[in-house]
Swiss-Prot record:
Residues 93-103 form a propeptide. GO terms for molecular function: hormone activity; hormone receptor binding; neuropeptide hormone activity; neuropeptide receptor binding; signaling receptor binding. The modification Phosphoserine is found at S129. It comes from Homo sapiens (Human). PANTHER family: ATRIAL NATRIURETIC FACTOR PRECURSOR, NATRIURETIC PEPTIDES A. The record marks R123, S124, C130, F131 as: Cleavage. Residues 62-105 are annotated as: Disordered. This is Natriuretic peptides A. Residues 1-25 form the signal peptide. The precursor molecule is proteolytically cleaved by CORIN at Arg-123 to produce atrial natriuretic peptide. Undergoes further proteolytic cleavage by unknown proteases to give rise to long-acting natriuretic peptide, vessel dilator and kaliuretic peptide. Additional processing gives rise to the auriculin and atriopeptin peptides. In the kidneys, alternative processing by an unknown protease results in the peptide urodilatin. The lineage of its organism: Eukaryota, Metazoa, Chordata, Craniata, Vertebrata. It comes from the Eukaryota. Disulfide bonds join C130-C146. It is linked to Atrial standstill 2: A rare arrhythmia characterized by the absence of electrical and mechanical activity in the atria. Electrocardiographically, it is characterized by bradycardia, the absence of P waves, and a junctional narrow complex escape rhythm. Atrial fibrillation, familial, 6: A familial form of atrial fibrillation, a common sustained cardiac rhythm disturbance. Atrial fibrillation is characterized by disorganized atrial electrical activity and ineffective atrial contraction promoting blood stasis in the atria and reduces ventricular filling. It can result in palpitations, syncope, thromboembolic stroke, and congestive heart failure.
Length: 151
C-alpha cells in the first residue's frame, strides 16, 4: 500500500470512530430509565392535583374580610388624594424653606469642605486603598497587602 492510501484509510477509520462516538455524547440521556420518568410524571400529576389552580377566582368578599390574627395589629391606611399633575406654589418657589434642594451655594460649600477634609487627612489614610493602617503595616513588612507598592 502506498502512503496516500494508508493515510486515507486511517483518516476514514478515525472519522468513523468520531461519528460513532458522537451518538453517545450525552451519557445522561440513557441514564434515566422509562420507569423513573413515569414515576416522576406521576409525582408531578399528584402535586398538580393537590395544588390549587391559579386560574381559580377567589371571591372578592374573601379578600376584603380582615384576617382575625392580623386584623387587630393593622390599622387602615390613610387616604391619599390622587395627584392632579399640578405643582403647588410652595414647591414651585423652592420648597417649604424658600430655597431649592440643590442651592448652588450650599452645594459648593459642601464640596469644598469635603475636598478640604480629604486634603488635610494624614498621608497613610489617603493612600490606603483597601483595609487601613494594620494592613498597611503588614504590607510594608511582608510585601503583601494593599499598599505593597510605595510611590
Amino acid at each position: 500500500m502506498s502512503s496516500f492510501s494508508t493515510t486515507t484509510v486511517s483518516f476514514l477509520l478515525l472519522l468513523a470512530f468520531q461519528l460513532l462516538g458522537q451518538t453517545r455524547a450525552n451519557p445522561m440521556y440513557n441514564a434515566v430509565s422509562n420507569a423513573d420518568l413515569m414515576d416522576f410524571k406521576n409525582l408531578l400529576d399528584h402535586l398538580e392535583e393537590k395544588m390549587p389552580l391559579e386560574d381559580e377566582v377567589v371571591p372578592p368578599q374573601v379578600l376584603s374580610e380582615p384576617n382575625e390574627e392580623a386584623g387587630a395589629a393593622l390599622s387602615p391606611l390613610p387616604e391619599v388624594p390622587p395627584w392632579t399633575g399640578e405643582v403647588s406654589p410652595a414647591q414651585r418657589d423652592g420648597g417649604a424653606l424658600g430655597r431649592g434642594p440643590w442651592d448652588s451655594s450650599d452645594r459648593s460649600a459642601l464640596l469644598k469642605s469635603k475636598l478640604r477634609a480629604l486634603l488635610t487627612a494624614p498621608r497613610s489614610l489617603r493612600r490606603s486603598s483597601c483595609f487601613g493602617g494594620r494592613m498597611d503595616r503588614i504590607g510594608a513588612q511582608s510585601g503583601l497587602g494593599c499598599n505593597s507598592f510605595r510611590y
